[in-house]
Amino acid sequence: MQIITDPIQMQAIAEKLRLNRQLIGVVMTMGALHEGHLSLIKEARKIAGTIILTIFVNPRQFAPHEDFHRYPRPFEQDAAHAKAAEVDYVFAPPVDAMYTGNFQTTVHPGPLGEQFEGKQRPGHFSGVATIVTKLLQITRPHIAVFGEKDAQQLAVIKQLVKDLNIDVRIIEAPIIRDENGLAVSSRNIYLSAKERDAATVLYKGLCHAERRIAEPCLDLDAIVPEVENIIKSALSCHPEYICFVDDETFLPASKAEKGKTYRLLLAVQAGTVRLIDNRKFMV
């Protein structure tokens, strides 16, 4: 495994791999690797012969009041995990290598990036879209694997690749959960034992929605307050948004139609930690 920090060097390696007809898969992370990230690497390995793991805590997707400076950066541990997962290249550039002093260009994802997470975190998806575009240009992958955990991010990236005619196939990987149903996340380390226990209401809410839709209940608006009550049953959990969307368009959905797929999106403040989760439903 090679660790590369220079974007120009990484791009040259990727171009050489392509010339040698190597199928490249990329997994983009901000480090603090966990089982969810490792599952993305496994998915990439099913298709690609060469795996590039990117580790970059992107300042442009954090608001000034968010946790950029305290975001975990255990690089040596991450490198060990990457090596054990048989990653071929770790691309871990410094911030000034990705955003030079006169850097001016930003990729704006449009309305898709302005709702839900985009509304709660203005500018977040512009930062995501910009860094994903740059990393795709640098690593030159044939496939890129992203987790369903960040469902709106996945939708933004799919739209970006389509709109900008970027020659890469986006692969979705399922959410990895712990034994209590909590979706694994690098930010889970911020949770106290009490907050972690309380946060299981997110999964309980998603499971309740699944049961209701299976009945079938096609009135999605009727399910939302039921899920809200489940989440609020944990006194430390405060919902920011609970919304069903059409999984194809990502537009809010009030009534379900048979044969279509929907996704329930959750954002919850669990004590001091903000958590997001979601589940997909076929009606």
From Swiss-Prot:
Residues given in the record as beta-alanine binding sites: Q61
Residues involved in ATP binding: 30-37, 147-150, 176, 184-187
A GO CC term attached to the entry: cytosol
Compartmental location: Cytoplasm
Keywords: ATP-binding, Cytoplasm, Ligase, Nucleotide-binding, Pantothenate biosynthesis
Catalytic residues (positions): H37
Reactions this protein catalyses: (R)-pantoate + beta-alanine + ATP = (R)-pantothenate + AMP + diphosphate + H(+)
Pfam families: Pantoate_ligase
Miscellaneous comment: The reaction proceeds by a bi uni uni bi ping pong mechanism.
Family: Belongs to the pantothenate synthetase family.
Protein name listed in UniProt: Pantothenate synthetase
Organism: Chlorobium phaeobacteroides (strain DSM 266 / SMG 266 / 2430)
Gene name linked to the record: panC
